[in-house]
């Protein structure tokens, strides 16, 4: 259903037809993003994480190794002005530690703490249990994610 909506919007954009606000892809994405941010703020509250902190943790959990701050920023599509305060808060809350690379002192490495490692399974399953049942089926969810990446990768 969402995929059909996006494809219809794409066809309308290609034809340069004027549209109503509800027909605009940008507004649909904006509205959905607001809804997800509100939802995630409630779900993640028990862990003291924001949505952006959660996505940062997902990348670190995925890698399961120390990462350069630059590499983390590239993966999250965040600049250092946004990433540094975010990492400061995660470090203060005990989720990550930062250390200078011994070989290159200019390079800062971010690494998971024992707290982060021990809570990984709990956080991921809590999110999954909350998100999938109320939003859509798992196959609809996958299809939606794929369509959004098709758009953002162009």
Predicted regions and their residues:
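Charged, amphipathic alpha-helical coiled-coil/dimerization segments
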Residues: 88-146
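Short helix-coil-helix linker/hinge
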Residues: 47-53, 82, 113, 136-139
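N-terminal leader segment of winged-helix/HTH proteins
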Residues: 1-47
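N-terminal helix-turn-helix DNA-binding core of bacterial DNA-binding proteins
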Residues: 34, 38-79
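Pre-recognition alpha-helix immediately N-terminal to the DNA-recognition helix
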Residues: 28, 55-59, 118
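Alpha-helical linker/hinge and terminal dimerization helices associated
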Residues: 32, 36-39, 76, 119, ...
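Residues within helix-turn-helix
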Residues: 69-70, 81, 88, 108
């Amino acid at each position: 259903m969402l995929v059909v909506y996006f494809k219809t919007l794409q066809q309308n954009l290609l034809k340069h037809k004027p549209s109503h606000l509800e027909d605009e892809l940008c507004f649909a994405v904006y509205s959905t993003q607001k809804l997800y941010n509100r939802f995630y703020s409630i779900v993640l509250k028990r862990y003291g994480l924001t949505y952006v902190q959660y996505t940062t943790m997902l990348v670190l959990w995925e890698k399961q190794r120390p990462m350069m701050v630059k590499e983390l920023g590239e993966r999250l599509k965040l600049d250092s002005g946004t990433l540094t305060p975010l990492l400061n808060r995660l470090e203060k809350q005990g989720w990550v530690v930062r250390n200078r690379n011994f070989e290159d002192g200019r390079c800062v490495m971010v690494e998971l703490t024992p707290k982060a490692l021990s809570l990984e399974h709990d956080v991921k399953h809590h999110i999954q249990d909350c998100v999938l049942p109320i939003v859509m089926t798992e196959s609809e969810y996958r299809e939606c994610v794929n369509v959004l990446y098709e758009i953002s990768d162009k």
